[in-house]
Amino acid sequence: MKTPGVMIAAVKSGSGKTTVTCAFLKQLLCRKKHPVSFKCGPDYIDPMFHEQVLKIPSKNLDTFFSDVSQIQALYEMELPGHDIAVLEGVMGLYDGLGGIREEGSSYHLARTLDVPIILVVDARGMGKSVIPLIAGFLQYDEKKLIKGVILNRTSKMFFDTIAPLIEEELAIKALGCIPNEKELTISSRHLGLILPEEMEELNFQLEKAGQLLEKYVDVDAMIGIAESALWEKGETVTEEVKLEEKEDLEEKAYSGKVTIFSRAIFRGKNKLYDTKNSGTNIIPPRIAVAKDEAFCFYYRDNLRMLEHYGAELVFFSPLHDEKLPENIHGLLLGGGYPELYAKQLEENESMRKSIKEALEQQLPSLAECGGFMYLHDTLTDREGTTYQMAGVIPAECQYMGKLVRFGYVEVQLPQGLTEKGTAERPEPEKIKAHEFHYFDSTANGEDCIATKPVTGRSWKCIHASDDHFWGFPHLYYPSDPKFVKWFLERTEKHI
């Protein structure tokens, strides 16, 4: 593909890469560019900044969740209609699984996609020591992907002094600096960053960040770095990928090794429900998806994968709607912040009743993290106030005052839930996931086993049966296409 791309990465978390990324995207829009953005890793909130505030399409790319060919397809399928791709890194550039592996790191993603890197360095309180710091990162860069540096939280006077030394000693472009201004600090939440709609001055902050980037950083040189990788390969820059290639990329991204399903309902190109090409009156399953202020954490590719297989998504609000949508065949309750809206969720008694009745009638359902919390009898917030929830799971969910689970896991599915291996030697099916929660349940479930990829530590989790799958892990569907097939096939009995 011939769309320019660049990654904004950092020496460590809290260096300002999100501010720089958003400011850069803002300046691209000012230049009448049509950017698309990506977030390295599993965090939901940075893509929400890009989409909701800057109105730029964004999604996650994660080299733990996906293999090399899948990552490339997931990246390339977003490029049509865009003339530059901006990737925001995660943590420090080389911080991957367990903090010790390259897999899952920003650098691993940049190397997989062969995109250049601009390194953001928090230079606050530093002098010439910033040079050996940068030098160490360059030494680790086997593929020579780091093409420029931005010094954050430092004065222009210092930058003008140190920049010639950086370029002379390290042979790398010093692109500019961003002054240390308090109003540019984006408040933290317990997962990534605060939700965009909850920040009164967010637009002001991003506007100011864009102005500072334009004033103190060579934005044209940043764009040039994105394009330089193409020039070095002798490729020409084009504005968009051919649209006809997109369907093949989706097939590669969402199908994995699953090419033919055993069910007779399979039609067409890997769709379970293809009403266009089947020649029959197949009714696609309608999946109700909770989406509002309380339930907003969804991997874009999870939803698109359901649609890719032919499902129709119907969005609704557990906060504001009175009941579930009509004529649905499945339910998806994603993560978010139900604890911040517990009072409103409790007060919407008709919705709680609607969901409980539907699940008691065995409506196929998936619930993760915040959605899982909502299904409990009660939820107790950090102030100790207890609220009534949907009452589907006879248990309590409460704030623990500390991080309960954090990081990547592989979830081993119950035997027989999906098929894998051979009859003689069945192999457990696994789906990759991520956890990050300060709440815990008195009944986390025992139907699956979650295992940490580096340490091998494992524990039981998830409530799973023939019609539901509920638990704390945030699942990444493309890592196991058969899981999606299993869920959609469960919806058939309700059509």
PLM-predicted stretches and their roles:
Residues 338-417:
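Cysteine-nucleophile active-site neighborhood
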Residues 233-282, 417-428:
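Intrinsically disordered, low-complexity terminal tails and inter-domain linkers enriched
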Residues 197-242, 265, 281-283, 291-295, ...:
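Acyltransferase
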Residues 282, 295-308, 312-314, 399, ...:
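C-terminal and late-domain segments of enzyme folds
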Residues 285-340, 344, 357:
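Phosphate-binding active sites in nucleotide-utilizing proteins
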Residues 2-19, 25-113, 121-148, 153-160:
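ATP-dependent carboxylate-amine ligase catalytic core
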Residues 7, 86-88, 118, 150, ...:
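Structural motif
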Residues 127-242:
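Internal gly/pro-rich beta-alpha loop/helix module
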